[in-house]
Amino acid sequence: MTRTATQATATEGRLAWSPRRGLTGADSVGSVPALGERLAVADSWLLRDGRVRGLGRHRERFLRACGDSGGPSLRQLVDFWRDMTDALPHTGEWFPRVELGAESRELRLLLRHAPPLGTGVRVWAAGQTDPRTVPRRKGPDLDILGRVRQRASTEGADEAVLITPSGLVLEGATSSLLWWEDDTLCLPSPQLPVLAGVTSALIQERAQRTGVRVAHRERTLADLEDREVWLVNALHGIRPVTEWTGGTKPLLRAGGAIRAAEWRQWLEGLMEPLE
């Protein structure tokens, strides 16, 4: 599949990869691969007019996760990634996802248009205990996290925050959690079951380069009241929490988004052309 041909005919759908044929065949976005097969590994990012942020980091995370879960050989993973990158469209806004099937061990590319992007986020703060089975790897728990987000949506929220049984905040269902305590950028302890987020890592590195103190802290939802809190991921970038919703429980007050705009502008500047 050549890059030129793919750009001219890019449509939403799923492409399966094999060493001999490369990427072939596409089914509808709404279908379920391999009779509802669970994903062993997944990774995704925003692609805007052929530009992407931190693609090399997504590659590293995906290849490492595939290796940790007994996936294809490194050579096959590298070849898949090359073919996948060549197949990405260079016009429009997309949210592609790379996948490794849990049973079939099949490598796939899901091409889908990006949903509307947000600059702020309403968060369900009822305290959703973390339901994941493999929290440090993206893929196995996407379905259950999707159900968590659906529940949050019924409460008028865009996202839900996961907590430990003892009430410590972890991350969003689809995003990393960061917050500010005075001039310190904070995030959950690495000892807690959180996913290593690409966007979160970029933000932490910028903070360290510019002299902003970064600290790992254990906090409950109540501790985040009146603080500037960000949910960050590869799709939306930085979204400050604009409202905490909690159904019948008392609502937390959202802090002002004092720093978010400047950091969002910096993050947007990291978009680079596909190689």
Locate each region found by the language model:
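Alpha-helix N-cap/helix-start motif
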Residues: 55, 170-171, 196
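Conserved alpha/beta cores of soluble small-molecule-handling proteins
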Residues: 1-161, 165-166, 200, 205-275
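Glycine- and Gly-Pro-enriched alpha-helical subdomains that act as flexible
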Residues: 168-190
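A contiguous pocket-lining binding segment that forms or flanks enzyme active sites
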Residues: 184-204
